Amino acid sequence: MSKSSVHTLLTTLDQRGYVRRLDDQRYTIGIRAWQVGCVATPLWMSRVAGPYMTELVNKVADGAALAVLDGVETVCIQLVESTQVVRVHDNIGNRCLAWCVSNGISMLATMQDEEVLRLLPDPLPRPTEFSFASEAEVLDKLAEVRAVGHSLMRRTWRPDTSGISLPVRGADNRTVAALCVSMPDYRATPDRLDETLAELRHTVRQIEREFGVTEPDASPFPIQKGVLAAQ
C-alpha cells in the first residue's frame, strides 16, 4: 500500500474515531475501535486492571472505576462495585463530562491548558450546583491537581457523591486512563480519603507495571507551556 493510501486510510479512521492522532504525529487506538471490540471481547486494559481493582475495592470498601477520555467525556471501561448497601452505582460504557468527575479531571490535568480549553464547551453544562461554572475554575482545579498529584471531586457530577482519582500511564509513559474510587459524599472524611488515596496509589503502580510503564517515578503531569503558563 502506498504512503498516500495509508495516510488517506488513517485520516478516515481518525475522523470516524477508530484511531486517534497524537501530538507527535503517531496514532493510537480510538474510542470507536474500543466500542467495537467490546462487542466481542473486553478491552485489554480492563482485563489487566480488573483483578487489581477488585483487590482495591476489598480494601477500601468503595467502588472503583477505570475510564478513558473521549474528547471531553470519560468512558467507563472497567468497574468493580462496592458490596456496601449504600454505594455509588455506575455501568461500563457510561459517559460523564470530564470536568465534572475525578477521573476526567485527572486526565485533563495531564494535558496542556491550551489543549483543555480547545475541548471545553462554552458555556459549561453544570449537572449540579457544585459543578464548575467557568473555564477559569476548571484551570484552577487542574493546577491544584498537578500540585497535589491527585484529583478529588465532591458533588460535581451527582449531588451526593465524591470521587478521588489518579491518572494511569501506558508503555510509552503517556496517560491512557484514570482510576477512581467513588463513595457517598458523607463517607468522604479526611481520614477515609487519605486511606483510600494510599491504596489507590498502590493499585495504580501495580496496573502501570502490567501496562509496561518504564518510568514509574515520573510525574504524569506536564510542565505547562505558552501564554497561560505565564499568567
Model-derived features: where do they sit?
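Acidic surface patches and DE-rich sequence motifs
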Residues: 22, 70, 170
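A short, flexible beta-alpha/helix-coil linker loop
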Residues: 33-36, 125-126, 184-188
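Amphipathic alpha-helical effector-binding/dimerization core
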Residues: 25-122
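Short, highly charged C-terminal tails/helix-capping segments
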Residues: 212-231
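N-terminal helix-turn-helix
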Residues: 1-43, 205, 209-213
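Short amphipathic alpha-helical signal-transduction/dimerization elements
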Residues: 108, 112, 201-208, 212
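Extended hydrophobic
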Residues: 130-204, 223
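Charged catalytic carboxylate motif
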Residues: 5, 32, 48, 137, ...
